[in-house]
Curated annotation (Swiss-Prot):
Principal location listed in the UniProt entry: cytoplasm
Full protein name: Ribonuclease 3
Functional summary from the UniProt entry: Digests double-stranded RNA. Involved in the processing of primary rRNA transcript to yield the immediate precursors to the large and small rRNAs (23S and 16S). Processes some mRNAs, and tRNAs when they are encoded in the rRNA operon. Processes pre-crRNA and tracrRNA of type II CRISPR loci if present in the organism.
PANTHER family reported for this sequence: RIBONUCLEASE 3, RIBONUCLEASE III
Organism: Francisella tularensis subsp. holarctica (strain LVS)
Xref: InterPro entries: dsRBD_dom, RNase_III, RNase_III_dom, RNase_III_sf
DRBM domain location: 153-223
Binding locations of Mg(2+): E40, D111, E114
GO cellular component: cytoplasm
This enzyme's EC code(s): 3.1.26.3
Oligomeric form and interacting partners: Homodimer.
Enzyme class: hydrolase
């Protein structure tokens, strides 16, 4: 065990046989060409399968569409960033000079989380990495309440509200992109011609900005008495 990583191994609940895999998983592309991107690709697939399997077995009455939405919520975005932070991954991320301070950025935390999973898989086997993933996710999965959880993303929910009321779908477009490459802010506009509505919101990616725009439009529709029909 490499001394400086012994604490991290304890937090992860896994001891690397080849610690260079862990180093690669923690290294951002701003530092070197030997970075975490390939491991991130692998870890993304491993994580998606493990979570899909546990959801399939645990929620036997849930339809395919709902399972997909729930899996998406668990393997993307804020969930991964929060898990990465809880496992102290942000304290070990290796960044180049151009990315200093980026160890708290959500996108980097998401990527590193997936890369570490890819590294554990290569360092061991599928059964081992599955066990580690389920340990990390256990508090989240055990607390899932299908009666209250929002498994539908905002764009999907908005689409259903509009279709249920025989209204055309909104058109999304990027208004502006501000900031440096690693700190971009996207401003997205959504237009509903049938309702004569124009809404805009910002996010650190186009996808996030579109979701926030959809959330705003849902709120406006709610004020007009338009809700999703159960």
């Amino acid at each position: 065990m490499v001394p400086e990583y012994s604490r991290f191994y304890n937090i992860l609940g896994y001891n690397f046989k080849d610690y260079t895999l862990l180093i690669r998983a923690l290294t951002h592309r701003s530092k070197t060409k030997k970075n975490y991107e390939r491991l991130e690709f692998l870890g993304d697939s491993v994580l998606s399968f493990v979570i899909a399997e546990v959801l399939y077995k645990q929620f036997t009455d849930l339809a395919e569409g709902k399972l997909s939405q729930l899996r998406s919520k668990l393997v993307k975005g804020t969930t991964l960033a929060q898990l990465a932070s809880s496992l102290k991954m942000d304290e070990y991320i290796i960044l180049g000079a151009s990315e200093q301070g980026g160890h708290k950025r959500e996108k980097i935390l998401e990527d590193v989380f997936e890369a570490v999973i890819g590294a554990i898989y290569l360092d061991s086997d599928f059964a081992t990495v599955k066990k580690v993933i389920l340990k990390w996710y256990q508090p989240i999965i055990s607390s899932i309440n299908l009666d209250t959880i929002k498994v539908k993303d905002s764009k999907s929910k908005l689409q259903e509200i509009l279709l249920q009321n025989a209204l055309s779908l909104p058109e999304y477009s990027i208004e502006t992109i501000d900031g440096k490459d690693h700190e971009q802010q996207f401003t997205v506009v959504a237009v509903s011609k049938d309702l004569n509505l124009r809404v805009k919101a910002q996010g650190t990616s186009r996808k996030k900005a579109e979701q926030k725009t959809a959330e705003k439009m849902i709120e406006m529709l709610s004020q007009q008495g338009l809700h999703e029909k159960k």
